[in-house]
Regions:
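Glycine-rich short-loop/terminal segments
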Residues: 1-81, 101-108
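Extended aliphatic helical segments
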Residues: 9-10, 28-31, 96, 120, ...
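Processing junctions and N-termini across compartments
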Residues: 26, 45, 86, 123-126
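Active-site or metal-binding loop neighborhoods of secreted/extracellular toxin and effector enzymes
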Residues: 77-78, 98-140
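Acidic helix/loop or adjacent segment enriched in Glu/Asp that either coordinates divalent metal
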Residues: 77-98
Length: 140
């Protein structure tokens, strides 16, 4: 998936009049899968515009969407407090939950499994942030 994102940016730089205007690489990409219902989605980090109700309810236990966590957040030494809903894992989980809604499947955050997050620019692996590990039980 990181390779697809890099190729998309290269094409947009070559042909700036087609499609979206020039943009830089997203920071992080992740893949989410629901084995129980055979659904896989991939996404990258950016601000979240709309959120599945199940994920939104869980996010709101820790603060408001788009703002750093303010409530019930476990403290890890030196870990940054990213805005809730900006992470690639949360976007991928949102896509899977929306796909399961369309199939009328029962949903649970415990049924979602995640790949290791990767930096898009060079595909280095990255540990999930504190917010993702708190909100999404199986985030790595």
């Amino acid at each position: 998936y990181c390779g697809q994102l890099r190729n998309k940016v290269v094409l947009q730089r070559k042909f700036p009049k087609q499609g979206n205007p020039y943009w830089d690489y997203p920071t992080v990409a992740s893949v989410c899968q629901s084995d129980r219902f055979n659904c896989t989605c991939q996404n990258h980090s950016r601000p979240m515009r709309s959120c599945n109700n199940l994920l939104l309810h869980e996010i709101q236990n820790y603060g408001n969407l788009g703002e750093p966590a303010t409530r019930n957040r476990p403290l890890y030494n030196g870990s940054p407090n990213y805005p809730l809903g900006n992470c690639a894992e949360q976007h991928a989980a949102n896509d899977v939950l929306n796909a399961l809604d369309k199939k009328n499947c029962p949903k649970s955050l415990n049924d979602l499994y995640f790949s290791r997050a990767r930096y898009v620019r060079d595909s280095r692996e990255l540990d999930a942030c504190v917010n993702c590990r708190t909100i999404l039980p199986n985030a790595q």
